[in-house]
Amino acid sequence: MFKKFEYKILYKRIFFTCLILVIYIIGSNISIVSNENLRTHKDSFFKLAITNVGGDLHTLNIFSLGLGPWLSSMIILTLINHKSNDKVKTQTRRERHFKERALTLIISAAQGFYIIHSYINKHAIKDSNMLILLLVLITGTLLMVWLADQNTTYGISGPMPIVLMSLVKSIFNTHFPKLNSSASLITMIIVLLVLALFILFFIELTEYRIEYNDIMNISAKDIPSYLSWKLNPAGSISIMVSLSLFMLTNNIVNFIGRFIVNHNFETHVFNFTNPVGITIYLLLQMILGYFLSRLLINTKRKSKEFLKNGNYFEGIQPGQQTEKFLGSKARRICWFGSIVVAIVLAIPMYSALLVPHLLKEVYFTTQMIVFVYIGINIAETIRAYLYFDSYKQILNKYW
């Protein structure tokens, strides 16, 4: 007898996510200044960075800043609260949200000021309506954060579908109509892209398993119990967060420089057009990827769970010895995953320096890597909903 499972919860979540994406598409097409003035303004680095966090600088619209300020505020607060977990646990959801939104407001104001000031310096827009434009950008950012927050609760994968849609829009608007390279060059780019995606698939779908003794599962001795970790637990969120922080650093340096040095000051250190900037970004990506992975694995909490449940590793004492054992394993796994992801991103970025006329194609490759990586994470989320929804008929008997 065939059983038909109705994935009603999943369908509702997909519908809600589609509704959020429709709102994002409409908002990203509402320009707040003339498009003709912005077509002459080209900043490939900034457009690439802001696209990967859900923003759009091809036109100055209400969602131009994207989710970068929000992602930056979350990682900053996470690093601040890392040593005081007890205080964080006592905070209410309203208190946490207030801190996130307040810091997001400050960061979005700084980034918005930098973007508008850059357009003014290059005579793309006039400075007479600067405060109004800044207010619109900040309001759009907070609205976008609210949409991502609602999608986390009622939709699928939180902010990731918004970033995915931003990448799709950027790829079609910027790259496809303008790829004029030779057939052999395009073939080489495709081969490198496939190789990079294969490595990312390997990292995402491969698990590192540590076998342990489960005292509650004595009847099934032939079936081993194991603790499984992904090779890169942080996933695509580390790329988005690292780009957001790198872009924030660039904005802060330029913001301070234009007040202290001169109003035309613009640093080229925190940029993808020089090896120093790329190296700084890759180091930031590795470090953030490592710490986010360690935060998600949380070996301290896992060792406490083992101590409470009575589970243990062969030859390892429960408690502190288990925590050290898991910490050493997690350290190797997290560094390996973050370094491999950084290497995959480094290849197209450094290639752009060696072959400058391929900058457009290289940025296209980078965006495709991020696009597929986010797509993998969304697919895993949908698979998880499919898995739990298949047990809905059984669970309904007890709930």
Swiss-Prot record:
Source species, domain of life: Bacteria
Q: Which cysteines are joined by disulfide bonds?
A: none
- What is a single cellular component term in the Gene Ontology annotation? plasma membrane
- Tell me which Pfam families the record gives: SecY (PF00344)
InterPro entries in the cross-refs:
SecY/SEC61-alpha, SecY2, SecY_dom_sf
Q: Where in the cell is it found?
A: Cell membrane
The record's listing under SUPFAM superfamilies reads: Preprotein translocase SecY subunit (SSF103491)
**What does the entry give for GO biological process?**
intracellular protein transmembrane transport; protein targeting
Identify the NCBIfam families for this entry: acc_sec_Y2, PRK12417.1
**Task performed by this protein:** Part of the accessory SecA2/SecY2 system specifically required for export of possible cell wall proteins. The central subunit of a protein translocation channel.
Q: How does it assemble?
A: Component of the accessory SecA2/SecY2 protein translocase complex required to export cell wall proteins. May form heterotrimers with SecE and SecG subunits.
What protein name is recorded for this chain?
Accessory Sec system protein translocase subunit SecY2
Its gene is secY2
